């Protein structure tokens, strides 16, 4: 597009619809009939897919327009389909309406009055009248309610019983009432729409917002659900057959059952033959005579009377089409609203034709060109699909002809049947071929293994599809890409361009009298000599290439540049010269990934001869996240003045000094420049006159115009005798003096640097940086001053003098430090890394103490004595158990790590810097680390001291199955080194094992980085797509692209993040009062502002707040609204946020002395300046705050580790962090998050002991926690309960901890324990046994779990606490679900007595005994065991009546239990016996019992697993629960502050506390994720994201479900599932208003945010 020629028309909206068959035929240039594409000579065949009517091909001219391949636009053709085919994209909707249709009366099966109600509601929603659509339900007529079915159904049901006359009468009354109700509703709708139109709430074209869209979606879904719920037609009372589909190709009709057929016969309606659309003559009277017509006798499925009574019948698409045509004609009243999201102004009828395809569009030839690979020519894949359709069409035509011929010749029925079945198969095939062409995934019988040929849908979707690859982003001309290399000598806002690019990139510059000389020379230089030109554009737009011309020819053209061409009229454009890129041109530089706006900035060009790469200044590396190890960057050369203006004034590098993420600087000097700055500004740096002047001249370069004065100003020397010397600080002062504006006061600044005073020696004050009137008086300049750091000298200059000065200072300092370091050199040798002999001794001594650390940690975790030797068998045994359990090993890792980390920090703090051979500042290593130039204390300590503990996924090095971490260690070795503690240092080398561990840790980091990139990239894409249209309006409100209000003010106070950093630095502002006064120039603004109203009001509110803010319910009954809510801050001076006002007033109150000392500045003046500063810090209208918010969350997420592993156990609750947590909050908006938590603030008067007790009382207690050991004894022998059958028995003996211990630790009584075992544990155990047996006997399904055929019992319904168990689909599960009572034959008293006797004898037998035990120690005191066993035998023999009754009850309720006893006295043990059939395979019973112990719950508050009492943070004492149950906590107000409960479960908070609380939770949770990594993201971005997620009063995810309600179809299509959204847009006949940025990009319009948010109108001069 040539923007120099304006166009009078533009696209303002796009309507979606479906082309009818008639329209396709009208558009088509030719019908395609021939499947052959080319003839033998390779020429296109007439009627084939490359027919010349569809476009020029193979150097043949197009027969439609007569143009060649270059200019012919292409023309579409069409293929006539022999039968209507289902459109695969609309198949689901077709299927819904087919199932909802009555095949007798051809209405929807839902009663007409209900359908009318939906029609009315949908019509109201077309005009955006949501409230009125809800009120419609209130319209009733006497006893008849619109939503009641009862009247109608009652009338229908009674029809049969009443006499004919009575039935007719009641029907008449009913229909009269219903018609009256319909007309009443229609009247209401008409009035509501008319009123809304007159009030201006809607328009003739309707109103369509995201909320209306959401309501409409819900209503249509509800309508479809209602339609499909009716089995019998509400209108005629007939049963229609059900349908089923097979893929997207076939629909079958299912036969009715006898009862339904009888009902239909009684009603006596006739079903039409929808193939021929003729009424059948006879009633459905049950006779199944074959039709006389031969054709119909074999045409099964043609005649409704001859359909089979059972099974399914294939229905032809013709019949489906005819059914739906009739239904759609009769149901227009509702369908015209279902299929139009806006008022249907065209009044076209909604037809069912949309669901079918009679004609297939053939794309023009130019879009289906064959691909060439060397000599081979491959046919286009689309042609293959279209050829198949043509071939099948011809087959159907031939079969039809054959059938007609056979019918005429009266050939036998069998032969005709064969032809007919082939015809049916061909119908299915053509449907399949059409499906494959439209959507390859919907074609049946795809060849396995082969990738299917992509259809139309595949061409649109995914990253490689039309939308994302060719519309949302395109390849461009006038761009270059090369490797970048550093260049500290160019300006920070420049880019060094190599000559190879400079002679290729051109700009079309119009020739004027002002640039004629320059352009003439460019033309003479030609295309190969820089600065030259490549071509000239004449007034008529024709181009003259200079390539290949001689110098004389070029001179001749150069001399005619201002001479107009002879045949051109007077009012024309100038000639243009396509000149080479030249110095000071502006280009856009971009480094991918483009994560935030600073990844693409405008640089000025500096062409550097003899270079081959792009040259970038060091200060830009932070913004681009670039390094010079081979990174490549893209350079784009804007091609018109508009783009150049934006690149120069908005996207320029100087303006990107602050990042919008947090408002902190993103550009600054790095590495060697910082080291040089430290040395240059240190107290012992002195320079002679020659050096001083050389440095000043070298860095300022006055000939390039970098000075702000006419000549360089220098300072007098500090030392005059013996010869003049200048300090490094004076050089800095001189630089500032020459680059800051001469008409403004010098800067005043007090700040701190990174290097503490003690490093410089006693009495040093170099840690404090002091600038007074632009002179550096004290302090070292390091990273904190001119790096990318807040409140340093460069940041302060940016605030006071603006971005240009800050950028210039960075450039000049960069050159100064480069020159300085070139002269003095900076190096780092081995001496800088050495420790003194004493230092080495300290290191060795401290590391000696670490020998026992691992053993002590292991002893502590295993509860053994501190002095236990490392080879103690009990220790090793316990360690083995711990290391086999993930949670326990986590605790061991945490304890060991904390101990060894203490040693590491002890070594480092002792040896560095006290033990280093060279001391700072002579130690270059220390100088780099301390000043922030490179590295940190960690790097220094790893080189000099030790590497420390290697961590993998937050844990120590994992252990192999053998119990070793590496083969060179012993199993379960406790030495810290075996767990990955590296005592070696890089200075003296590390051992092979240590090297291996270090490599493991390094590998984890690399994998994490690779995986993280895609995760965070997708997260950012989701955010950007949802927020892309959110912008600042001219009334300071934040709105979405369609005008939906998101926030009343950006961040609540309308402040721009990049302007707020110094807003509350009042002392700095006071010090620089006069400079700021000059900057803001209040005198020029006063006449445009209201300076009284807001100030008066704010005084009133401030007074009221001071007086009443201490009152208890002050916030609930505020008298005055905040001043920002009443007065627009852009217009009224003094309209500031309450927060800012309070801070300002507090500063003025506390610092009144400062105003007395400062000359001429009083409090009133300062307050006015700060209010003006607030006004000048407002966000600009048009700012795309949505995209900035998404970038500000997306970009820092790449710095987070992907998986953060915080294991449960060490006084901390398990919590998801990092990108997984961000995805959980933002992308899935999950209602069931991985680690839900509540934070409960404890009252101050509750002691820690009470808090711990409360913790225990609400924590979940499992049976496994009170069990000391389980012993299982397995025996095989004869069963005593089942008539002597062989049985396999298991005696399970559970030994608990001491009763006092578990009641004290968990507050559990022995009665509770017994209750859990008998009511819950045994049920679960039996279920697990059945499951295990089933698993073992998969082959013999029915015979399992029969155990001993003792009692006909089953597993009873288990306790409510076991709901969480996820069983397979067993018998038990179905019993649980249906809550059925289990039936069994209860044994009588005699039988019980017999059983008891048998049990006693079996105890004494002990046949084939096999003991399993998981006891903690095997070499226990044998006597004690025997003693306990004796007491158990005695207890079993001497059961009292209560115990016997309990045992018999348990036995009677369970399948396998034959004996049960519990220690009621001391609660020390429980024993029971299980009997299974002898042929049951051996079970690992101990494992099963252990597992069930862990699943059996003694006590639990629903949804809360455990509660922990972490260490207080910031003095706040809290409890943290795993799991969320607010209601349960509300009852605990004696211990906790119920009003202060918070949770990380947004969905739970929304449900309980409402949407505002949920919004705040989202903000807090995202902020928590970032704060863990010390990343600061402004709360404004988080507020905006939270507001967008909760804007509909719900918790909407940033995924395609959350996007569904958006009004921009193009935006949804360019995101994901293009065809799904396209289908919906087409079916709803949606209108795309082109409001959203994505939609505007699709149609090539300028975006309506930023500089596109307004139009510039030129004043038309009055006609003379």
From Swiss-Prot:
Keywords assigned: DNA-directed RNA polymerase, Magnesium, Metal-binding, Nucleotidyltransferase, Nucleus, Phosphoprotein, Ribosome biogenesis, Transcription, Transferase, Zinc
Region spans: Bridging helix: 992-1004
Main location group: nucleus
GO terms under biological process: nucleolar large rRNA transcription by RNA polymerase I; ribosome biogenesis; termination of RNA polymerase I transcription; transcription by RNA polymerase I; transcription elongation by RNA polymerase I; transcription initiation at RNA polymerase I promoter
Molecular functions (GO terms): DNA binding; DNA-directed RNA polymerase activity; metal ion binding; promoter-specific chromatin binding
Binding site for Zn(2+) 1: 62, 65, 72, 75
Keyword set includes Magnesium: yes
Chain sites annotated for binding Zn(2+) 2: 102, 105, 233, 236
Residues binding Mg(2+): 627, 629, 631
Subcellular location: Nucleus, Nucleolus
EC numbers, comma separated: 2.7.7.6
Catalytic reaction list: RNA(n) + a ribonucleoside 5'-triphosphate = RNA(n+1) + diphosphate
Residues covered by region (Disordered): 280-310, 1343-1423
The UniProt record lists the keyword Phosphoprotein: yes
Disulphide-bridged cysteine pairs: none
GO cellular component: mitochondrion; nucleolus; nucleus; RNA polymerase I complex
A Pfam family it matches: RNA_pol_Rpb1_5
Basic and acidic residues bias locations: 1393-1414
Subunit structure: Component of the RNA polymerase I (Pol I) complex consisting of 14 subunits: RPA135, RPA190, RPC40, RPA14, RPB5, RPO26, RPA43, RPB8, RPA12, RPB10, RPC19, RPC10, RPA49 and RPA34. The complex is composed of a horseshoe-shaped core containing ten subunits (RPA135, RPA190, RPB5, RPO26, RPB8, RPB10, RPC10, RPA12, RPC19 and RPC40) where RPA135 and RPA190 form the DNA-binding cleft. Outside of the core, RPA14 and RPA43 form the stalk that mediates interactions with transcription initiation factors and newly synthesized RNA.
UniProt function note: DNA-dependent RNA polymerases catalyze the transcription of DNA into RNA using the four ribonucleoside triphosphates as substrates. Component of RNA polymerase I (Pol I) which synthesizes ribosomal RNA precursors. Besides, RNA polymerase I has intrinsic RNA cleavage activity. RPA190 and RPA135 both contribute to the polymerase catalytic activity and together form the Pol I active center. In addition, subunit RPA12 contributes a catalytic zinc ribbon that is required for RNA cleavage by Pol I.
Family: Belongs to the RNA polymerase beta' chain family.
Miscellaneous information on this protein: Present with 2840 molecules/cell in log phase SD medium.
Protein name: DNA-directed RNA polymerase I subunit RPA190
């Amino acid at each position: 597009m040539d923007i120099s020629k304006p166009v009078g028309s533009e696209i303002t909206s796009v309507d979606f619809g479906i082309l009818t068959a008639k329209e396709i035929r009208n558009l088509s240039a030719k019908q395609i009939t021939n499947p052959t594409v080319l003839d033998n000579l390779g020429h296109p065949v007439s009627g084939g897919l490359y027919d010349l009517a569809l476009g020029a091909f193979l150097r043949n001219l197009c027969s439609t327009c007569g143009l060649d391949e270059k200019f012919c636009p292409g023309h579409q053709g069409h293929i006539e389909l022999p039968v209507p085919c289902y459109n695969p994209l609309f198949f689901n909707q077709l299927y819904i309406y087919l199932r909802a249709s009555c095949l007798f009366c051809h209405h929807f099966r839902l009663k007409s009055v209900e359908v009318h109600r939906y029609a009315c509601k949908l019509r109201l929603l077309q005009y955006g009248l949501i409230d009125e659509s809800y009120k419609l339900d209130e319209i009733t007529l006497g006893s008849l309610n619109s939503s009641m079915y009862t009247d109608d159904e009652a009338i229908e049901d009674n029809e049969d019983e009443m006499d004919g006359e009575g039935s007719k009468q009641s029907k008449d009354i009913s229909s009269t009432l219903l018609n009256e109700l319909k007309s009443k509703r229609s009247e209401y709708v008409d009035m509501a729409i008319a009123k809304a139109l007159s009030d201006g709430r809607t328009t003739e074209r309707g109103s369509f917002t995201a909320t209306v869209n959401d309501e409409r979606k819900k209503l249509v879904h509800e309508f479809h659900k209602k339609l499909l719920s009716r089995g019998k037609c509400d209108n005629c009372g007939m049963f229609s057959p059900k349908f089923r589909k097979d893929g997207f190709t076939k629909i079958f009709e299912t036969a009715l059952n006898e009862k339904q057929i009888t009902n239909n016969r009684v009603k006596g309606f006739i079903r039409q033959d929808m193939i021929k659309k003729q009424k059948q003559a006879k009633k459905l009277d049950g006779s199944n005579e074959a039709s006389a017509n031969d054709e119909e006798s074999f045409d099964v499925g043609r005649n409704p009377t001859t359909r089979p009574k059972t099974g399914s019948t294939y229905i032809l698409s013709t019949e489906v089409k005819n059914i739906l045509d009739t239904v759609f004609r009769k149901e227009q009243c509702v369908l015209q609203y279902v299929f139009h999201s806006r008022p249907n102004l065209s009044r076209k009828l909604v037809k069912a034709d949309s669901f079918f395809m009679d004609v297939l569009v053939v794309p023009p030839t130019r879009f289906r060109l064959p691909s060439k690979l060397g000599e081979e020519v491959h046919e286009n894949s689309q042609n293959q699909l279209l050829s198949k359709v043509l071939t099948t069409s011809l087959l159907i035509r031939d079969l039809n002809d054959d059938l007609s011929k056979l019918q005429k010749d009266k050939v036998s029925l069998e032969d005709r049947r064969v032809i007919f079945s082939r015809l049916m198969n061909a119908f299915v095939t053509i449907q399949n071929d059409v499906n494959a062409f439209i959507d390859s995934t919907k074609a049946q019988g795809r060849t396995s293994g082969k990738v299917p040929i992509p259809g139309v849908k595949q061409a649109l979707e995914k990253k490689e599809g039309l939308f994302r690859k060719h519309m949302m982003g395109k390849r461009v001309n006038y761009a270059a890409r090369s490797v970048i290399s550093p260049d500290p000598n160019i300006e920070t806002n420049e880019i060094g361009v190599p000559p190879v690019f400079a002679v290729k990139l051109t700009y079309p510059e119009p020739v004027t009298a002002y640039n004629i000389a320059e352009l003439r020379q460019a033309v003479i230089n030609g295309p190969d000599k820089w600065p030259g030109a490549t071509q000239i554009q004449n007034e008529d737009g024709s181009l003259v290439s200079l390539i290949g011309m001689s110098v004389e020819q070029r001179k001749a053209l150069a001399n005619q540049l201002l001479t107009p061409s002879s045949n051109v009229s007077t009012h024309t454009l100038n000639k243009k010269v396509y000149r080479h890129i030249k110095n000071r041109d502006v280009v856009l530089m971009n480094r991918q990934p483009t994560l935030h706006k600073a990844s693409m900035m405008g640089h000025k060009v500096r062409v550097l001869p003899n270079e081959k790469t792009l040259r970038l200044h060091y200060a830009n590396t932070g913004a681009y996240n670039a390094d010079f190890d081979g990174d490549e960057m893209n350079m784009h050369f804007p091609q018109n003045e508009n783009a150049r203006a934006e690149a120069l004034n908005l996207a320029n590098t100087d303006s990107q000094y602050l990042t919008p993420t947090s408002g902190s600087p993103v550009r600054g000097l790095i590495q060697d420049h910082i080291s040089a700055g430290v040395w240059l500004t240190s107290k012992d740096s002195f320079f002679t006159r020659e050096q001083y002047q050389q440095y000043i001249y070298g860095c300022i370069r006055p000939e390039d115009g970098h000075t702000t004065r006419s000549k360089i100003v220098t300072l007098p020397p500090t030392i005059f005798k013996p010869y003049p010397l200048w300090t490094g600080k004076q050089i800095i002062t001189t630089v500032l003096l020459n680059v800051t504006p001469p008409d403004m006061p010098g800067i005043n600044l007090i700040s701190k640097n990174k290097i503490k005073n003690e490093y410089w020696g006693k009495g040093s004050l170099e840690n404090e940086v002091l600038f007074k009137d632009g002179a550096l008086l004290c302090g070292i300049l390091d990273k904190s001053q001119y790096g990318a750091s807040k409140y340093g000298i460069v940041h302060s200059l940016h605030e006071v003098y603006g971005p240009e000065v800050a950028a210039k200072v960075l450039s000049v300092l960069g050159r100064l430090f480069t020159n300085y370091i070139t002269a003095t050199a900076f190096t780092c040798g081995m001496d800088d890394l050495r420790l003194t002999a004493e230092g080495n001794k300290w290191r060795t001594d401290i590391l000696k103490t670490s020998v026992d650390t691992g053993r002590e940690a292991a002893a502590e975790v295993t509860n053994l004595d501190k002095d236990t030797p490392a080879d103690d068998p009990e220790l090793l045994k316990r360690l083995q158990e711990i290391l086999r359990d993930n949670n326990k090993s986590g605790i061991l890792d945490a304890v060991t790590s904390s101990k060894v980390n203490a040693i590491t920090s002890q070594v480092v703090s002792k040896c560095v810097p006290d033990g280093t051979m060279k001391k700072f500042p002579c130690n270059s290593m220390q100088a780099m680390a301390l000043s922030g130039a490179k590295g940190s204390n960690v790097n220094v300590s790893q080189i000099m001291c030790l590497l420390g503990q290697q961590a993998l996924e937050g844990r120590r090095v994992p252990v192999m199955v053998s119990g070793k971490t590496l083969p060179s260690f012993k199993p379960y070795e406790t030495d810290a080194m075996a767990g990955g503690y590296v005592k070696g240092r890089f200075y003296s080398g590390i051992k092979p094992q240590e090297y291996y561990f270090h490599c493991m840790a390094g590998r984890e980091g690399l994998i994490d980085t690779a995986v993280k990139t895609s995760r965070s990239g997708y997260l950012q894409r989701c955010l950007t797509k949802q927020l892309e249209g959110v912008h600042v309006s001219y009334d300071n409100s934040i709105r979405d692209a369609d005008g939906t209000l998101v926030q009343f003010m950006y961040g609540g106070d309308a402040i721009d993040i990049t302007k707020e950093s110094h807003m509350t630095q009042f002392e700095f502002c006071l010090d620089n009062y006069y400079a700021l006064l000059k900057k803001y120039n209040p005198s020029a603004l006063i006449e445009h502002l209201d300076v009284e109203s807001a100030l008066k009001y704010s005084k009133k509110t401030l007074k009221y707040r001071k007086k009443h803010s201490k009152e208890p319910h002050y916030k609930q009954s505020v008298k005055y609204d905040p001043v920002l809510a009443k007065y627009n801050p852009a217009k009224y001076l003094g309209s500031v946020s309450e927060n800012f006002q309070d801070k300002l007033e507090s500063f003025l109150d506390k610092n009144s002395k400062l105003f007395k000392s400062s000359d001429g500045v009083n409090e009133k003046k300062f307050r006015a300046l700060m209010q003006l500063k607030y006004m000048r810090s407002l966000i600009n209208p048009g700012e795309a705050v949505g995209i900035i918010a998404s970038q500000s969350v997306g970009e820092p997420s790449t710095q987070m580790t992907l998986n953060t592993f915080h294991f449960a156990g060490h006084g901390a609750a398990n919590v998801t962090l990092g990108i997984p947590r961000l995805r959980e909050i933002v992308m899935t908006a999950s209602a069931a998050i991985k680690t839900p938590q509540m934070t409960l603030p404890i009252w101050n008067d509750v002691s820690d002991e009470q808090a711990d007790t409360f913790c225990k009382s609400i924590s979940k207690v499992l049976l496994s926690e009170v069990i000391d050991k389980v012993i299982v004894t397995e025996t095989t022998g004869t069963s005593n309960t089942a008539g002597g059958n062989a049985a396999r028995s298991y005696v399970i003996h559970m030994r608990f901890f001491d009763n006092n211990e578990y009641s004290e630790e968990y507050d559990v009584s022995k009665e509770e324990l017994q209750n859990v075992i008998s009511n819950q544990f045994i049920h679960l155990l039996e279920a697990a046994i059945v499951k295990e047996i089933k698993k073992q006997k998969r082959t013999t399904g029915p015979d399992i779990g029969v155990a001993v055929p003792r009692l006909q019992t089953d597993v009873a319904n288990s306790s409510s606490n076991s709901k969480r168990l996820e069983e397979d689909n067993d018998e038990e599960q179905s019993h649980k679900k249906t809550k059925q009572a289990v039936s069994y034959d209860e044994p009588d008293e005699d039988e019980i007595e017999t059983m008891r006797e048998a049990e006693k004898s079996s105890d004494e037998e002990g046949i084939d005994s096999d003991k399993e035990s998981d006891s903690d120690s095997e070499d226990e005191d044998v006597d004690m065991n025997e003693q306990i066993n004796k007491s158990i035998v005695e207890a079993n023999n001497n059961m009292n009546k209560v115990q016997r009754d309990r045992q018999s009850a348990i036995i009677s309720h369970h399948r396998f239990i034959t004996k049960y006893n519990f220690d009621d006295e001391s609660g020390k043990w429980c024993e029971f016996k299980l009997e299974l059939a002898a042929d049951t395979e051996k079970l690992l019973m101990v494992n099963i019992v252990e597992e069930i112990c862990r699943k059996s719950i003694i006590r639990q508050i629903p949804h809360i697993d455990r509660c922990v009492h972490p260490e207080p943070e910031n003095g706040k004492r809290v409890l943290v629960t795993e799991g969320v149950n607010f209601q349960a906590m509300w009852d605990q107000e004696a211990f906790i502050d119920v009003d202060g409960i918070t949770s990380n479960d947004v969905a739970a908070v929304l449900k309980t506390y409402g949407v505002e609380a949920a919004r705040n939770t989202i903000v807090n949770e995202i902020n928590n994720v970032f704060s863990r990594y010390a990343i600061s993201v402004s709360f404004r971005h988080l507020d905006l994201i939270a507001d967008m997620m909760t804007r509909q009063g719900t918790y909407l995810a940033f995924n395609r479900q959350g996007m569904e309600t958006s009004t921009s179809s193009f935006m949804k299509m360019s995101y994901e599932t293009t065809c799904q959204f396209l289908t919906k847009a087409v079916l709803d006949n949606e209108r795309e208003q082109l409001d959203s940025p994505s939609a505007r990009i699709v149609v090539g319009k300028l975006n309506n945010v930023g500089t596109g948010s307004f139009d510039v109108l030129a004043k038309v001069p009055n006609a003379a």
